[in-house]
Structure formats: structure tokens, C-alpha cells
Amino acid sequence: MQNKQSNSIRTVVATGIGAAVIFVLMKFVAIPTGVPNTQVNVAMGFLALLGAIFGPVAAGLAVFIGHALNDFVTYGSPWWTWVIVDGLIGVAFGLAKNRLKIENGVLGTAKLVWFNIYQIIVNFIGWVLLAPTGDIIIYHEPANKVYLQGVITWIADSISVAIIGTILLVLYARTRTQRGSLTKER
């Protein structure tokens, strides 16, 4: 019971702090791409780390809340199709936690290659398939506009995660003690 309660507290705290960090990164550290309403999102690199440490619930909720707050502050109201897709991408990144196991302090090349292939596929599904289709169905946006935005966002977010996310994952894994690496002194 104690472990389950401490895990839920940890998840709530990670969600709150993660949402705040994602909001700040989306609001102040995004790099415009030249295509309207798209940017290179540094927050996605952080999201990869958040998901790998805290799992799907914390990552999904943190990016959902952070993105919704950013849209509300920036545009006056959230663009729900993209906010929801970001939340789903956060969940997907969190599902990689058990495969990456960065808490063990070992994050080899094979795991990094797997994760980057995985995140490119996840970003493709989210930004090229789901978000633009949602924009067309819900907001009646022109298909050529939203699919262009989706493709640009897929490329930008995939690059952000591949560079920033990979660096953060490697640096974090290096701070963890490898299992079985400590020996008792006599």
C-alpha cells in the first residue's frame, strides 16, 4: 500500500512540474519553422525524458496540460485536436519506460536506436495522421493547410526528440547507479 501511494504522489508531482516545464518551453523556447502555427518544439525532447522516468500517465497529462495552457495563453483558447494528440504522444512516450529502463543506469545504443525509430513512428501517427484529420473533421480546416502543418510538425518534433530527447535520456541514465555495480567493502 505504501509503495502504491508513494508512486501516485510521485506521478502527481511529476505531472505538475512536467506541465509547468512543458508550458514554459512551448511558450518561450519554441523555434518558428516558417509554416504558420508550427515550430520546433524543445518541449518534446523534455517529454521523452519525462515519459521514460515517470511513465504514460505523468507524461500524457503533463503535455496535455502544458500544451492546453500554452494555447490558452497564446491564442485565447486551446486547439483541442493538437492538445489531445500531444497527450497521446506523451502516453506513447511513457509506454517506452519499461523498454528503456533508464532507472537501471544502462542505456545502450540499441535502446536509443529503438526509441528513436519508435518516436518517429509515434510522431508520424500523431502529427501526420491524427491531428490534421481531426482538424478537418472538427474545425473544417482546409486539408492542404493542416496536412502541411502536420508533416512539418512531425519532422520538427522527431528531430527535437532525436537530438534533445536522446541527450537528456543519456545524461539522466548516467546519473543512475547501474544495478550490480556496487560491491560491499570488507
Swiss-Prot record:
Main location: membrane
Membrane topology qualifier: Multi-pass membrane protein
Keyword set includes Nucleotidyltransferase: no
Pfam families hit by this protein: ECF-ribofla_trS
Coiled coil: none
Keyword annotations from UniProtKB, A to Z: Cell membrane, Membrane, Transmembrane, Transmembrane helix
Transmembrane segments: 12-32, 45-65, 76-96, 112-132, 151-171
Stated name of the protein: UPF0397 protein lp_0150
